From Swiss-Prot:
GO cellular component: cell surface
Organism whose genome encodes this protein: Rickettsia rickettsii
Residue ranges occupied by any WH2 domain in the UniProt entry: 383-400
Keyword NADP: no
Biased composition (Polar residues): 477-494
Name recorded for this polypeptide: Arp2/3 complex-activating protein rickA
Entry superkingdom: Bacteria
Disulfide bond sites: none
Amino acid sequence: MVKEIDINKLLAQENNALNAILSHVNELCKQNKQLQGLIEIQNETKELEKEHNRSLPWFKRFVKTVSNVKYILIKSEEQLTNEAIKYNNKILKDIDNKIYNIAEKSAPLKQALQEEIEKSFKDLTKKDLSKDQRARLSEVFFSYKSKPERFSALHMTNPLQFINAEALEKQFNSLNATKQNIQNLISENSNIKELKEIQKQVAEIRAEVPHTFFEKLNNIWQNVKNVFVNNSEQVLAKNKESNTRTIRKIDEQLYKTQHKFEELIENKERNIKDIIAKLPDNEELQKIVSNLTNHMASKKEPILANVSLAKPLENNIPPPPPPPPPLPDNNIPPPPPPPPPLPDNNIPPPPPPPPMAPVKTLSKAVEATTVKKLENQPRPSIDTSDLMREIAGPKKLKKVEFDPNTGKPVAHSHSKPAQNVNKPSGLESIFARRVAIEMSDSSSSESDSGNWSDVSVNRNKSKMLKTKGERDAKMTTHAQKINNRNSQKPSFVR
């Protein structure tokens, strides 16, 4: 209540200045009376002039009327010439400066002015405006921000109070321009669904301190770039070149703003330390210095970590690694890599293969034995004429009969006469002879002397040489055993 009384007193004192502003608004409406909606605003201006009680509600109505004039002029710019647009912008800037000069004399009135302008802008942007018109409205609407003293009304502690806030004002205006560029980029690529959600986040950044404004805007901008990278196929062909230029421009703006913030923070830190150095030393002051040091260290780390994020997209690609230095001519090649580590279950590696020396010795002994056998004892010749004659001879097929009940073949016994039982057939005798010769040959190869010997006896017994007669008798006995076994088979088995 006390604040409102002070505001009413100030407005009463500034009555002449307010009337001058109303006359400027009225003149602006007359110059653009062909535009739809300005006649109604002109009538509202006349009603405001007739009211002599200049209170806070009256001031809010007055600010809303000026905001409506800006909206109509921006919406109907296509109907105006370039000279008319320049003239209108000049008059609007004069009106804003005069309103701000009155409001800066009272902190409550200045805060009320800012809140009313924000509210009017939020309501007007919901109307039918194109993206270019919305950007122009933002530029015209917040022209009052050209006064750096606006930041003196921020609720900040004394050590962080910026008495001369010109640098912060420049950063804030730069961030507003960057924010508008991001909104325009999102609007131009509205076919990408992911950007619609980010557009809401950008619109929610309002009335921020410059540094927090930058942090929020920078984080959102990284998300926007990620959307473009992951959805490059959805970008329209006509927008690719303009998107590249806009992205590069926004990256440069954020990069410059970030470095400027670093300088401001470092300068403010030095100023605070200079102030503390002049104060008497005590424990509480030491705690403040320690807290300040920790706080500044924590604030600098994320800024430095995000520097690469604010750089253009082309710089985000890491450079290729440098080539390895050339080795000198007399340099020893590097040793082979160490063996791979054991697996998790710690299974030991298989044992190494046994040495090959014994194998080579054995092979040499075998070669020597074989050569010696070939030289000392040649293989006996085998007559294969009987075998070939029996194979080439006529073959008689036997008829196979089947049992009508079971369907299985019936076995017939064709027993030969008793006198022919022990008589071997032609093929059987030939095979028996051949088997006996090969068995005797294999037994002779296993003997150390290379002569024909009996291998069927126990190796522990002393080996004795046999005569040719004994060997022939043994071969005949072995052949008869084979013939007896073959004669005991059924006749239908070959």
